[in-house]
């Protein structure tokens, strides 16, 4: 049996760093090296930390709460000592270690027990090949989520992490530009070896590959005699030993004298807890049960909170089937094309409902409605006046007259259709749509053409 535990590291979504007022900007692609720094985050002599970023602490509490953790009301900052080029102070400020209680502990998320969730500061970015150290990252607030070793396969790990990321996106807890990293702990108790930790794996693909390689390596007889730390070589697809695993005493944890103890009032925790939305998993079950939606469509709706809430606000006011179709397909289509999130544009629910009612009442064709919807970005409008210019052809006699004209103008397509090339019918339908400025009903047009071509 394989036992796998995770330590997930994510950047908390804040505007400023944890102990200074420098902007929280992630990655060299967003800023030049060492331009977003100050004496505090570069550990200049005499520089003292500011009070911890309240937004970061509150976000950490929300993360712990949504993972079902018990919140500890008293938090004591620690100094975690180790020697590495990216750590200018020689220690990391964290709420973990021998003398600390984490922000949250003893939680559970999707049947996986959460040991703890705690907050800490990120070190700088060090490039061992060039020796360059970029302090833009130094001091960014990190959340670390530690699970019990409850996983038994790589796929189980990946599925769980995907659900975790989606859930935390509902509370906008993590910086979406920064991604996550994971330390993976693997042991095979039947082989009587020690636990192996694989550090700093930076993508779901690499996490999966690292786990599968490490299980295979240990089963082949390379069992660790002592706990050890390894790294994953992405290019070679293997894990490489870095060092023996450190124990807590190796980090020489001491209480941080420059930072005050954090005391959480009960009312503060209750307020944060009451502000939490339903989780994606809860919404999924609700949408399927309440609106009889297929699971696949419900999964699309619940990937993002703003889409799920948008749907819930319109579904009782229009045909539910139409609401599902136009939210999961057409709304997402225009957002993806514009490379925008729903909360980055101004699409009013009443305008969307109005458009769907025009379709439902056969005032306009779906093709014309899609054209109008395309114009809803960046800002929606009442579609009724626009629809009046392009009202649907209601007379079958009028539509039949257009179809006869198209048949007359396209003898080659007619000949192809009658010789068995059925795709030619779509060509003729397209010509009708073009002639009528998409005011013709697609289904009716097809039926009339098929009848006329018999």
Regions found by a protein language model. Name each.
Residues 1-278, 289-291, 295, 317-320, ...:
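Basic, nucleic-acid-interacting segments
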Residues 180-190, 289-312, 320-338, 376-378:
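Core structural elements
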Residues 343-353, 366-434:
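Strongly charged, low-complexity linkers/loops
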Residues 13, 216, 308, 328-336, ...:
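Amphipathic alpha-helical core segments of compact helical bundles
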Residues 39-43, 141-149, 191-195, 309-314, ...:
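Short, hydrophobic beta-strand segments
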Residues 269-275, 312-318, 352-364:
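Extended, non-catalytic structural segments that build the interaction scaffolds
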Residues 292, 314-323, 363, 419-423:
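Structural motif
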């Amino acid at each position: 049996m394989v036992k796998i535990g995770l330590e997930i590291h994510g950047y908390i979504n804040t505007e400023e760093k944890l102990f200074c007022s420098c902007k929280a900007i992630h990655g060299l692609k967003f800023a030049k090296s060492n331009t977003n720094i100050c004496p505090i985050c570069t550990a200049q002599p005499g520089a003292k930390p500011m009070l911890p970023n309240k937004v970061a602490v509150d976000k950490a509490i929300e993360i712990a709460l949504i993972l079902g953790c018990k919140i500890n009301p008293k938090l004591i900052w620690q100094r975690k000592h180790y020697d590495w080029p990216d750590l200018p102070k020689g220690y990391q400020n964290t709420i973990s270690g021998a003398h600390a209680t984490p922000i949250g502990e003893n939680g559970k998320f999707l049947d996986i027990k959460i040991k703890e969730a705690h907050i800490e500061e990120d070190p700088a970015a060090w490039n061992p090949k060039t020796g360059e150290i970029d302090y833009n990252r130094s001091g960014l607030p990190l959340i670390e989520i530690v699970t019990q070793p409850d996983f038994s396969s790589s796929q189980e790990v990946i599925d769980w992490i995907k659900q975790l990321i989606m859930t935390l996106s509902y509370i906008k807890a993590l910086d979406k530009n920064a991604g996550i990293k994971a330390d993976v702990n693997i042991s095979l108790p039947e082989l009587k070896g020690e636990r192996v930790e694989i550090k700093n794996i930076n993508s779901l693909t690499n996490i999966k590959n690292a786990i599968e390689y490490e299980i295979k390596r240990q089963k082949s007889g390379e069992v660790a005699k002592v706990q050890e730390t390894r790294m994953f070589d992405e290019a070679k697809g293997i894990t490489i030993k870095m060092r023996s695993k450190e124990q807590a005493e190796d980090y020489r944890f001491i209480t941080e004298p420059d930072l005050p103890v954090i005391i959480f009032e009960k009312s503060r925790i209750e307020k944060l807890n009451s502000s939490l939305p339903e989780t994606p998993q809860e919404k999924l079950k609700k949408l399927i049960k309440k609106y009889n939606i297929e699971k696949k469509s419900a999964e699309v709706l619940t990937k993002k909170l703003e889409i799920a809430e948008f749907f819930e606000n319109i579904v009782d006011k229009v045909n539910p089937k139409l609401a599902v179709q136009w939210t999961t397909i057409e709304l997402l289509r225009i957002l993806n094309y514009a490379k925008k999130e729903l909360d980055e544009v101004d699409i009013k629910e009443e305008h969307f409902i109005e458009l769907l009612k025009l379709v439902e009442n056969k005032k306009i064709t779906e093709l014309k409605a899609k054209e109008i919807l395309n114009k809803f970005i960046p800002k929606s409008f009442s579609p009724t006046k626009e629809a009046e210019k392009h009202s649907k052809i209601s007379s079958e006699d009028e539509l039949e007259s257009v179809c006869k004209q198209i048949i007359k103008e396209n003898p080659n397509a007619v000949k192809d259709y009658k010789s068995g090339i059925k795709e030619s019918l779509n060509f003729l339908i397209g010509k009708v749509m073009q002639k009528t400025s998409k005011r013709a009903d697609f289904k009716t047009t097809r039926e009339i053409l098929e009848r006329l071509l018999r």
